[in-house]
Amino acid sequence: MDTLDELLPREKMLRSGIASLSDVELLALFLRTGTPGKDVMTLAKEILQHFGSLYGLLSADFAQFRGVNGIGLAKFAQLKGIAELARRYYSVRMNEESALLSPEMTREFLQSQLTGEEREIFLVIFLDVQHRVLQHSRLFSGTLNHVEVHPREIVREAIKLNASAVILAHNHPSGCAEPSKADKLITERVIKCCQFMDIRVLDHLIIGRGEYVSFAERGWI
């Protein structure tokens, strides 16, 4: 039987919509049950306080979860499943909707793909002449603070797909999204390499912990 604490977030969602739930209520809705002597709302509040935010929670590994009372393997699996569902949702949405509808959608997709990665990943979205998504690929992976990017490989893949434009993105596992000098230099190299084949670089987004930097928004592209 559902407890009162379990029903409260559910009834609020049905009455006012899922967006009306606080982070604690949303987490409680997914956890469903508390632990002996601790209701689910209290457990959800303590978990969020421990990790600082939903981002910190969903990007944590099992070793970090084990330090929280009430979080076992089952609840860890539930929460990691939520993060993976979000990642797959945005991936499918990009493929099915075919076009980048807005900068916000692009950012949300890239955050879903790159947030929580422990190494730097360089991802490229390939677009046709109408800016419809042809493919998105993780072309390069690196270390905690560096990824080797080869502009010619980006151009080669774009030509193979008959792409007329690309959006570049990579993550900073450190959490700070501010671009380094190396980030700016590689962006310039990719732009120059693409220009030879009449391929436009629309943006380069750097994804940090709960933040991002868009080269286009800053007027660098």
Curated annotation (Swiss-Prot):
Every MPN domain range: 99-221
Domain of life according to the entry: Bacteria
Ubl conjugation as UniProt keyword: no
Pfam family, one: RadC
Entry's Gene Ontology molecular function annotations: metal ion binding; metallopeptidase activity
GO biological process entries: proteolysis
Binding site for Zn(2+): H170, H172, D183
Motif (JAMM motif): 170-183
UniProt keyword list: Hydrolase, Metal-binding, Metalloprotease, Protease, Zinc
Family (UniProt): Belongs to the UPF0758 family. YicR subfamily.
Name listed for the protein in its UniProt record: UPF0758 protein YicR
Gene that this sequence comes from: yicR
